């Protein structure tokens, strides 16, 4: 079994590309059923956020990569975008190292941001619910979560956390001097939407409106805040008329706010959704300001230097954690092989022993039978090693011969 990952992220792909290859907003159960139906795919975890879409897989043959790319390409709406031009393949230890760095926030657009860990955990949970995760992937993710917890407790990588949500609010503040007199509309009540809401409430705007597909979730978030209200997405046309700032963090497959919704009133539009939820043409209207996820980079760069030192400390913890994981995996593999070896030996001994005991009970010469039993066991136990040594000798594999000699305590010098 081999461990691989295929990824499209913000480092190599601009927002329009990430939007095309995003798997968020699709039926999760359907995604898992379809990917597990591919020959040589054994287990899978699918991660899709605003900055990346990654698929982690246990496979039985590397040839399956082409089939996975075909599967992924099938969800792309615009055929001009070819996944082979953008994806990155990782294998083995590289996958685990990347996932550890990712969960610790070291691969994020905002260095050290904590939201990604929750997103990785959510992806892991969904994989388990869909019976898509196996023992090896499960051990990998458990070690990743333990590593992220250790990094958070032993470094200050998340000190004064700066997230994409926080950076979005920073952009809004730059455009509007006095947010306390403004109405803010947040679209989406997921993890990022809730974080946006909490950042906005700290600025005490005139009114905060939170729109979501299910109003119960929006009501739960807004219920403890004054001047906050929950709404259905179907109310967007009316809500936009009231809003000065519109921020979207929602999973949709097409634009839910377009130019037909807005008049001459100046507004700030910030879209951190992938795929995009707000039509970029909104920014072409003279009175509007429009930002997407990639525009947040400038804000984020201001905060990177503060976290670089803590990042180096986190890297050391991750390297140590990876070493621990690999050592444990070696032990698991060797213990499994040892257990199988003993089971094989037990099977050989039990069959011959029962035959020998039956002969003794029938009055046969015990000494002769024991000698015969010992001879038969010797032949059976040494049969496969002898065959293996002969085969290694034919192939000129002196390294295999040396290894087998060591296994049986023989002189390797001869």
Curated annotation (Swiss-Prot):
Pfam families: GlutR_dimer (PF00745), GlutR_N (PF05201), Shikimate_DH (PF01488). It is an enzyme of class 1 (oxidoreductase). Pathway: Porphyrin-containing compound metabolism; protoporphyrin-IX biosynthesis; 5-aminolevulinate from L-glutamyl-tRNA(Glu): step 1/2. NADP(+) binds at residues 188-193. Its EC number is 1.2.1.70. The active site is at residue 50. PROSITE patterns: GLUTR. The keyword Disulfide bond does not apply. GO terms for biological process: protoporphyrinogen IX biosynthetic process from glutamate. The record marks 98 as: Important for activity. Keywords: NADP, Oxidoreductase, Porphyrin biosynthesis. The keyword Protein biosynthesis does not apply. Substrate binds at residues 49-52, 108, 113-115, 119. GO terms for molecular function: glutamyl-tRNA reductase activity; NADP binding. It catalyses: (S)-4-amino-5-oxopentanoate + tRNA(Glu) + NADP(+) = L-glutamyl-tRNA(Glu) + NADPH + H(+). During catalysis, the active site Cys acts as a nucleophile attacking the alpha-carbonyl group of tRNA-bound glutamate with the formation of a thioester intermediate between enzyme and glutamate, and the concomitant release of tRNA(Glu). The thioester intermediate is finally reduced by direct hydride transfer from NADPH, to form the product GSA. Possesses an unusual extended V-shaped dimeric structure with each monomer consisting of three distinct domains arranged along a curved 'spinal' alpha-helix. The N-terminal catalytic domain specifically recognizes the glutamate moiety of the substrate. The second domain is the NADPH-binding domain, and the third C-terminal domain is responsible for dimerization. Catalyzes the NADPH-dependent reduction of glutamyl-tRNA(Glu) to glutamate 1-semialdehyde (GSA). Homodimer. Belongs to the glutamyl-tRNA reductase family. This is Glutamyl-tRNA reductase. It comes from Francisella tularensis subsp. holarctica (strain FTNF002-00 / FTA).
């Amino acid at each position: 079994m081999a461990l691989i990952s295929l990824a499209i992220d913000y480092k190599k792909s601009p927002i329009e590309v990430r939007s095309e290859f995003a798997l968020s907003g699709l039926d999760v159960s359907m995604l898992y059923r379809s990917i597990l139906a591919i020959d040589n795919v054994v287990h899978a975890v699918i991660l899709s956020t605003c900055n990346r879409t990654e698929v982690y897989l246990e496979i039985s043959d590397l040839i399956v990569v082409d089939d996975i790319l075909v599967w992924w390409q099938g969800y792309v709406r615009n055929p001009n975008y070819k996944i082979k031009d953008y994806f990155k393949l990782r294998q083995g230890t590289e996958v685990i190292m990347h996932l550890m760095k990712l969960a610790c926030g070291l691969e994020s657009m905002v260095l050290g941001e904590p939201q990604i860990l929750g997103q990785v955990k959510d992806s892991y949970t969904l994989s388990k619910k869909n019976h898509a995760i196996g023992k090896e992937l499960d051990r990998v993710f458990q070690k990743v979560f333990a590593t992220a917890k250790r990094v958070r407790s032993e470094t200050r990588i998340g000190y004064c956390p700066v997230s994409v949500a926080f950076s979005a609010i920073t952009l809004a503040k730059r455009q509007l001097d006095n947010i306390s007199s403004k109405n803010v509309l947040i679209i989406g009540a997921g993890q990022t939407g809730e974080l946006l809401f909490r950042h906005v409430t700290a600025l005490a705007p005139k009114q905060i409106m939170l729109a979501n597909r299910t109003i119960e979730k929006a009501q739960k978030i807004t219920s403890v805040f004054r001047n906050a209200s929950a709404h259905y997405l179907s109310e967007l046309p009316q809500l936009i008329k009231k809003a000065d700032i519109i921020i979207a963090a929602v999973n949709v497959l097409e634009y839910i706010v377009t130019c037909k919704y807005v008049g001459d009133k100046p507004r700030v539009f910030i879209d951190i959704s992938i795929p995009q939820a707000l039509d970029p043409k909104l920014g072409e209207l003279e009175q509007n300001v429009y930002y997407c996820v990639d525009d947040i980079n400038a804000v984020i760069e201001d905060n990177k230097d503060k976290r670089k030192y803590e990042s180096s400390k986190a890297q050391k913890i991750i390297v140590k954690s990876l070493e621990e994981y690999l050592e444990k995996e070696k032990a698991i593999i060797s213990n499994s092989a040892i257990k199988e070896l003993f089971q094989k030996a037990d099977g050989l001994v039990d069959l011959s022993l029962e035959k020998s005991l039956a002969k003794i009970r029938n009055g046969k010469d015990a000494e002769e039978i024991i000698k015969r039993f010992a001879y038969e066991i010797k032949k059976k136990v040494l049969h496969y090693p002898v065959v293996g040594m002969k085969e290694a000798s034919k192939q000129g594999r002196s390294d295999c011969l040396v290894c087998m000699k060591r296994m049986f305590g023989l002189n390797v010098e001869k």
